[in-house]
C-alpha cells in the first residue's frame, strides 16, 4: 500500500502540505518532481536491488555479490535522469523510505541464503549515518537475522570516513564487526586515500575504484603501485578486490600482480535477484562460466 505523504514527519519533504517549499528555478522544479516520483516508486516497490557477482578468478568461485539499487518499471530499468541515484541516496535515508529499504535488505539476505552461502555487499552512504546520532542501532539499519551479519559486508566510501560523526561511525563499525559483518572500503583511490585509514579503521576489504583498474594495462606506474598495494594488503590481512573489470586484458593484468578477486561487466553485470538466483543454480551445475 502506498503511504500518504501526510505520514511523512519532515515537513520539508511533504510536497502536498501547506508548508511545502516553492521551487525558485527550473532546476529546482525538476528536482522536486523527481523526488516525488522517487518516493512514489519506493512505496510502490519499483526501487529494488539488483545483484552483481564477485568472483575469485583462479579458484573459479562465486564468493559474493554487490547489492545495487535500481529503479525497475514494467520489468525494465527506468532511468529518469542522470542524477536520479544521487537524489535517491538522500531520499532513502528519510522515514518512511529508510524503513522500506531496510526491509528489502533483510529480505534479500534471507532469499540468497536459501540458495548459497555467499557474502552480500551493501553500500551505506554517509547519509545513513545520521541515524547513528538519532540512536538507531545496527539491527535497525541492517536487520535482526543473525545470518545477515555473518554473510554481509558493509561498504563505506572514503568520503564517508571524512564525515564529522567519526565517533559514531567508529562505534557502528565496531558493532558491525562484533556482530559478524565485514567492512569494505569502496571506491578506493577515488578520493584522498591515505594509509591512516588502515590504522584508524578495522577494514577487511578494499575495493579498487574503476579509475585505478582501467589504468593498469596502460600505465606501468599504475601496475607498480597496485602490485605493492596488493603486497601491503596481504601483510595486513586485508583483501583487495578490483571493480570495473571489463576486458580480458585487464583481468589478466590484475592476476599477474596478485589481485584475483574481480567484479565487472566481463564476469557479470548487475541483474534482478530472481535472475541471479537462477544463475547461482547454473553456476553450481557448471553452466555459468567465468571469463
What residues fall within each predicted segment?
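Catalytic core of bacterial c-di-GMP phosphodiesterases, primarily the EAL and HD-GYP domains
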Residues: 2-6, 94-168, 244
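PAS and related sensory helical modules
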Residues: 77-86
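Short beta-strand edge/capping elements of PAS-family sensory modules
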Residues: 63-66, 80, 151
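Alpha-helical scaffolding segments of alpha/beta enzyme cores, especially the outer helices
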Residues: 136-140, 168-178, 224-231, 253-256
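EAL-family c-di-GMP phosphodiesterase catalytic domain
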Residues: 1-32, 39-42, 52, 57-61, ...
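A structural signal for short, well-ordered beta-strand segments
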Residues: 51, 67-69, 122
Amino acid at each position: 500500500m502506498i503511504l500518504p505523504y501526510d505520514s511523512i514527519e519532515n515537513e520539508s519533504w511533504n510536497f502536498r502540505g501547506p508548508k511545502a517549499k516553492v521551487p525558485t528555478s527550473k532546476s529546482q522544479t525538476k528536482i522536486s518532481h523527481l523526488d516525488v516520483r522517487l518516493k512514489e516508486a519506493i512505496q510502490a516497490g519499483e526501487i529494488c536491488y539488483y545483484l552483481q557477482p564477485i568472483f575469485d578468478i583462479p579458484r573459479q568461485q562465486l564468493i559474493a555479490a554487490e547489492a545495487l539499487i535500481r529503479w525497475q518499471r514494467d520489468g525494465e530499468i527506468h532511468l529518469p535522469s542522470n542524477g536520479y541515484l544521487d537524489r535517491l541516496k538522500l531520499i532513502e535515508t528519510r522515514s518512511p523510505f529508510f524503513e522500506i529499504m531496510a526491509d528489502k535488505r533483510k529480505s534479500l539476505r534471507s532469499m540468497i541464503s536459501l540458495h548459497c552461502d555467499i557474502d552480500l555487499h551493501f553500500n551505506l552512504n554517509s547519509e545513513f549515518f545520521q541515524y547513528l546520532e538519532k540512536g538507531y542501532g545496527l539491527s535497525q539499519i541492517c536487520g535482526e537475522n543473525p545470518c545477515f551479519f555473518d554473510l554481509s559486508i558493509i561498504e563505506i566510501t572514503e568520503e564517508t570516513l571524512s564525515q564529522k560523526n567519526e565517533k559514531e561511525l567508529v562505534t557502528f563499525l565496531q558493532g558491525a564487526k562484533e556482530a559478524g559483518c565485514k567492512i569494505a572500503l569502496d571506491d578506493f583511490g577515488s578520493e584522498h586515500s591515505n594509509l591512516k585509514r588502515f590504522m584508524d579503521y578495522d577494514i577487511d576489504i578494499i575495493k579498487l575504484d574503476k579509475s585505478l583498474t582501467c589504468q593498469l594495462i596502460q600505465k606501468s606506474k599504475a601496475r607498480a603501485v597496485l602490485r605493492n598495494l596488493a603486497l601491503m594488503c596481504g601483510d595486513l590481512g586485508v583483501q583487495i578486490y578490483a571493480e570495473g573489470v571489463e576486458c580480458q586484458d585487464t583481468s589478466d593484468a590484475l592476476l599477474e600482480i596478485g589481485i584475483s578477486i574481480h567484479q565487472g561487466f566481463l564476469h557479470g553485470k548487475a541483474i534482478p535477484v530472481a535472475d541471479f538466483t537462477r544463475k547461482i543454480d547454473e553456476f553450481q551445475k557448471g553452466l555459468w562460466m567465468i571469463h
